[in-house]
Swiss-Prot record:
Gene3D superfamilies: 3.30.70.100, Rhodanese-like domain (3.40.250.10). This is tRNA uridine(34) hydroxylase. It comes from Pelagibacter ubique (strain HTCC1062). Belongs to the TrhO family. Its EC number is 1.14.-.-. Catalyzes oxygen-dependent 5-hydroxyuridine (ho5U) modification at position 34 in tRNAs. Keywords: Oxidoreductase, tRNA processing. GO terms for biological process: tRNA modification. Transmembrane segments: none annotated. PANTHER family: RHODANESE-LIKE DOMAIN-CONTAINING PROTEIN 7-RELATED (PTHR43268:SF3), THIOSULFATE SULFURTRANSFERASE/RHODANESE-LIKE DOMAIN-CONTAINING PROTEIN 2 (PTHR43268). Pfam families: Rhodanese (PF00581), UPF0176_N (PF17773). The active site is at C172 (cysteine persulfide intermediate). It is an enzyme of class 1 (oxidoreductase). The lineage of its organism: Bacteria, Pseudomonadati, Pseudomonadota, Alphaproteobacteria, Candidatus Pelagibacterales.
Length: 301
């Protein structure tokens, strides 16, 4: 069993190149996999490993980056290691939006999962899913709307169209995208902006299914693909043709072929591409029979 730990922290960081090397070396030493993104504005990461190794790694990360606690964190379990390798990346922003976040100037507008239902049940509240469309399609909250933007940098264009007097309840996977979006709205003069504390993952971990207003599963950016209530690994897999999530229902379509295509990409792939993907899948299947992992195998479950 592996622990999966997601976290972020907005704090001015320096010596990024030096810290990248220190972090990378320690991840390798402790056999921790996943991705850590560092920028001048802070850190955003999801990493996974055995419990004791992960615990010491978390302590080491705080020491290297010089802070005592994270702004937000979540932990879940996985029967398999959901990441291929350890990666530490230096970026201009931990979440690309063209907006630098200063936590000192930010209001405390986080809504606890236990109070979230009451807020989004209010018909006057705009329930805003700040994730990408394909994530929204896997699962979302009751009454939510999605901006339908290709990347987060386009999000401000959508936000500019909203009424400043309308209460807005935003949510995303772990909370970090909403941190930036809420700062943007506050700077634009919006007064009633709220965000789900700890994001969807925190909600699914703490709210029982019978009390939940969440429909579907939550897409995650690792080889679990999706999680359900209790942060149990979900039922989705990933299409090798287009890298979009595929549900058990999608797999019943004639357009679905394991390792080749799904309902999202079948009509857009050329015959040459499909033949290439079939050959790749054949190699993966042969590797599985011998108990080894093929270089092109993207999923572990």
């Amino acid at each position: 069993m592996f622990d999966v730990f997601g976290f972020y922290k907005f704090k001015k960081l320096t010596s990024l190149k030096k810290n990248k090397i220190l972090l990378q070396d320690y991840l390798i030493k402790k056999n921790i996999r996943g991705t850590i993104i560092i920028a001048n504005e802070g850190v955003n990461a999801t990493i996974s490993g055995k419990a004791n190794d992960l615990k010491s790694t978390i302590t080491k990360i705080k020491k290297i980056l010089n802070f005592k606690k994270f702004d937000s964190e979540n932990i879940s379990k996985s029967k398999f290691q959901p990441f291929h390798k350890p990666k530490v990346k230096i970026k201009k922003e931990v979440v690309p939006m063209g907006l630098s976040l200063s936590s000192k100037n930010k209001k405390n507008n986080h809504i606890d999962p236990k109070k979230w239902n009451k807020l989004i049940n209010d018909k006057d509240t705009l329930v805003l899913d700040s994730r990408k469309p394909f994530e929204y399609n896997v699962g979302t909250f009751k009454r939510s709307v999605n901006p339908d933007v290709a990347n987060f940098r386009e999000f401000p264009k959508y936000l500019n169209k909203l009424k400043k007097t309308k209460p807005i309840a935003m949510f995303c996977t772990g909370g970090i995208r909403c941190e930036k979006a809420s700062v943007f709205l506050e700077k634009k003069g919006f007064k009633n902006v709220y965000q789900l504390k700890g994001g969807i993952l925190n909600y699914l971990k703490n709210i029982k299914k019978k009390e939940s207003l969440w429909n579907g599963e939550c897409f995650v950016f690792d080889n679990r693909i999706s999680v359900k209530h209790g942060l149990i690994t979900g039922t989705y897999s990933m299409c090798s043709g287009c890298r979009k999530p595929v549900s058990p229902k999608d797999k019943k379509s004639k357009k679905y072929e394991e390792g080749v295509s799904c309902v999202n990409c079948h009509d857009n792939l050329t015959q040459t591409q499909k033949e290439r993907f079939r050959m790749r899948q054949k190699q993966i299947n042969l590797a599985k029979k011998t108990g080894s992992k093929h270089i092109f195998q993207k999923e572990f479950k």
